[in-house]
Curated annotation (Swiss-Prot):
Catalytic function, reaction form: uridine(1939) in 23S rRNA + S-adenosyl-L-methionine = 5-methyluridine(1939) in 23S rRNA + S-adenosyl-L-homocysteine + H(+)
Protein name listed in UniProt: 23S rRNA (uracil(1939)-C(5))-methyltransferase RlmD
Enzyme's top EC category: transferase
UniProt xrefs under InterPro entries: 23S_rRNA_MeTrfase_RlmD, MeTrfase_TrmA_AS, MeTrfase_TrmA_CS, NA-bd_OB-fold, SAM-dependent_MTases_sf, TRAM_dom, U5_MeTrfase_fam
Signal peptide range: none
Length: 468
């Protein structure tokens, strides 16, 4: 049964009375919804079909929030949470819901948003592509853990942020992390607690790449030589690449730091670093990235998502394909690789972060993709007059949560025949879909992507074609 976080009672406030409510549905954040005195009440960890005892925690004019006290009548879709930290840690929020029910909820939420903005009463079943779903556990290849140094007892906590709080929940393992990463959390916690410069440690970022396990430890000051030796010994024993990152963002491999006198250690150039990488296109392409670069955290779903995007675009001889918000080349590399045997096919990747553009160019060079070029640009600006842009036959968009509304205003001048839109926020996808529909495009495929099982987060991808 799910474990519910019990806050300490505020003695200066009189607690509101307990209510017994019937939950009718989930909201887009995965909270149960009920009605009380004409208001919608949002109840985290409550499920549709359940009768629950709750206590109101916040009341607004048109809605209220409540804390779940007891489940009086349980939903058959309720599941036992697999993580001992569930209900305290702020990472997962749907472990109490069976996996198939999670996916059904996400599909329904996506469809409702698309219907709302499209003006269509329903999503055409012929448009509904199969969802891309993930294994329920151990799917995350990347995570950032926070640290907290207690100046009173000189102790250090390592963990994730608590639910709706900046407090840190110390953890020993995490069932949604790739197993090598989960297994590192407790050893890292013990190691960092022993260091002399605990007060100078920031967050810890863990990455499981195809070429090994990487850890980046943020430091605010140069560490003493004894700490460097302890970190280097740990990296060697665990068989990981352990990097330190200073205030400037510079990275240093602890194995290449020569211990100096008491003041610290000597730093080497970033060019000496081994960078994490992952394969695309059934191993035909390798994508390298630096810690801090954005990459999709679910490796298995990313592979299938990229393959589906390439298939949907249906590349042809002589076409020019634009990949906007391209990052380090996640889609561009696969598109260019598929197009190597198509005479005259060209892929152009555009990204707003200069460091990622440089890494993308390195990736194109490493993979010998002569039909691929990358450019740095302000993605909110009109790029239609850029000399390097030219004719665009097909378009791939993979924007951040804010979506691609500004870009779509000038992209209509290019009139690409097909548009694949990959979204980490269905609300902005639905909004931008209405723009594409108004420009003469038709929605041909819509796929829900369950990139983050056990959480409310929904990703999606859609294919639009210009009406003929």
């Amino acid at each position: 049964m799910a474990q519910f976080f019990k806050e300490k009672a505020n003695k200066s406030k009189q607690l509101s009375p307990k209510l017994s409510l019937n939950v009718t549905q989930l909201d887009h954040l995965g909270a149960g919804m009920a009605q009380h005195q004409g208001k919608v009440v949002f109840i985290p960890q409550a499920l549709p079909g359940e009768r629950v005892s709750v206590q109101l925690t916040d009341q607004k004019k048109s809605f209220a929030k409540a804390k779940l006290i007891k489940i009086e009548q349980q939903s058959p879709e309720r599941a036992d949470a697999s993580c001992p930290h569930y209900g305290h840690c702020g990472g997962c929020d749907l472990q109490h819901l069976a996996l198939d029910a999670q996916q059904n909820h996400k599909q329904q939420s996506l469809n409702e948003l698309m219907v709302k903005f499209s003006g269509s009463p329903v999503i055409d079943p012929q448009v509904q592509a199969a969802p891309l779903v993930s294994p329920p556990w151990h799917y995350r290849r990347r995570a950032r853990l926070a640290t907290y140094f207690n100046n009173n007892d000189k102790s250090l906590k390592l963990g994730f942020r608590a639910l709706s709080s900046k407090q840190i929940v110390p953890i020993k393992q995490c069932p949604v992390l790739a197993e090598p990463l989960s297994a590192l959390i407790n050893p890292f916690s013990l190691l960092l607690a022993r260091l002399k410069a605990k007060a100078s440690l920031g967050h810890l970022e863990l990455t499981q790449a195809d070429n090994g396990t990487f850890a980046v430890l943020r430091v605010t000051k140069v560490l003493p030589a004894a700490d460097i030796r302890a970190l280097a010994s740990f990296a060697l024993t665990q068989g990981i690449n352990l990097l330190l990152q200073d205030d400037s963002g510079a990275l240093t491999d602890v194995m290449t730091m020569a211990p100096a006198e008491d003041e610290g250690a000597t730093q080497v150039e970033q060019s000496a670093l081994t960078l994490p990488e992952y394969a695309l296109s059934q191993g035909q392409v390798s994508c390298q990235f630096t810690p801090g670069n954005f990459v999709q955290v679910n490796a298995e779903v990313n592979q299938r998502m990229v393959e589906q995007a390439v298939n949907w675009l249906d590349l042809q001889v002589g076409e020019r394909v634009l990949d906007l918000f391209c990052g380090v080349g996640n889609f561009s590399l696969a598109l260019a690789n598929r197009g190597q045997n198509l005479d005259g096919l060209e892929v152009i990747g555009v990204e707003g972060v200069p460091e990622m553009v440089q890494q993308a160019r390195e990736n194109a060079k490493r993979n010998n993709l002569a039909n691929l070029s990358f450019y740095h640009a302000d993605l909110s600006a009109d790029l239609s007059n850029e000399k390097w842009l030219g004719k665009i036959d097909k378009l791939l968009l993979d924007p951040a949560r804010a979506g691609a509304f500004e870009s779509l205003q000038w992209l209509q001048k290019m009139k690409p025949k097909k548009v694949v839109y990959v979204s980490c926020n269905p609300a902005s996808l639905a909004r931008d879909s209405s723009v594409l529909l108004s420009q003469g495009y038709q929605l041909k495929q819509l796929s829900m992507i369950d990139m983050f099982p056990q959480t409310h987060h929904i990703e999606a991808m859609a294919l639009f074609e210009i009406a003929t």
